[in-house]
């Protein structure tokens, strides 16, 4: 069934990201399935190949769900899609027109899925940072980020998995001014797969605006009462994301989930 779903994606034009949601019994099976997905894409897509992520969370009403991100080229503007690698061989896509550049990255995770959440988060964010520096961008250029966290609400040594992730995210995000607000973001739990990050970053002549929801408090100003951590060595970091992000020149709105 997975190959049938993936084959349907090959027929789409300008596919830039594939995200496969499925059930895994443990992290060993997760790594096996992730390797299968990466090898399948390498065999069946020509460059520029889409970035790929495997999310170890069974869909509610199916065994597999494939999320496909593709581009529609505007008739009045040419764009290029190039497959790029960092110095440490982290793969990503660069999309460019005459007035803007967008980075599509996915599947960013630690090499060892058995490390503590904090260490896994640091390794994943270092890969994000490496891509951004390669493109002469910074964290403030990220407009959309997807965060998939194994057992997101588990408590270890008094600290919640999600809070440990937020603390690391806060440290890396501190290097940027965030003049256009934090990214729109997804933060969901998974059964396995460690810490996994996808992101889109944009720079150039584009108008980027953060979006609020009057019915919700902004996540990045949550109070300590809703943040679960007992670390004495660090201040609790809030979830750094906006409820949405508008990239108006691209007629695009990213909604947080």
Predicted regions mapped to residue ranges:
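Surface-exposed beta-loop interaction hotspot
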Residues: 73-76, 81-84, 190-194, 198-248
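Cyclic-dinucleotide signaling modules
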Residues: 89-105
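Conserved "HGTGT" condensation-loop signature of ketosynthase/thiolase-family condensing enzymes
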Residues: 8, 40-41, 110-112
């Amino acid at each position: 069934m997975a190959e049938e779903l993936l084959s349907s994606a090959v027929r789409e034009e300008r596919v830039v990201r594939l995200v496969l949601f499925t059930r895994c019994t443990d992290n060993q099976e997760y790594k096996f399935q992730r390797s299968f997905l990466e090898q399948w894409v390498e065999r069946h897509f020509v460059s520029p190949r889409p970035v790929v992520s495997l999310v170890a969370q069974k869909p509610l009403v199916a065994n597999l769900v494939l999320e496909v991100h593709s581009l529609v080229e505007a008739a009045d503007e040419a764009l290029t899609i190039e497959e790029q690698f960092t110095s440490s061989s982290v793969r990503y896509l660069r999309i460019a027109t005459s007035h803007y550049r967008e980075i599509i990255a996915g599947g960013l995770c630690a090499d060892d899925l058995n490390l503590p959440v904090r260490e896994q988060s640091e390794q994943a964010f270092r890969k994000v940072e490496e891509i951004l520096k390669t493109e002469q961008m910074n964290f403030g250029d990220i407009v959309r980020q997807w965060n998939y966290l194994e057992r997101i609400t588990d408590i270890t040594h008094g600290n919640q998995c999600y809070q440990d992730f937020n603390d690391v995210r806060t440290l890396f995000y501190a290097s940027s001014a965030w003049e256009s607000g934090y990214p729109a973001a997804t933060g969901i739990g998974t059964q396995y797969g460690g810490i996994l990050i996808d992101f889109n970053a944009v720079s150039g002549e584009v108008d980027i605006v953060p979006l609020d929801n009057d019915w919700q408090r902004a996540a990045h100003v949550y109070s300590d009462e809703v943040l679960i951590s007992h670390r004495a060595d660090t201040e609790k970091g809030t979830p750094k994301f906006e409820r949405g992000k508008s990239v108006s020149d691209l007629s695009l709105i990213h909604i947080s989930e």
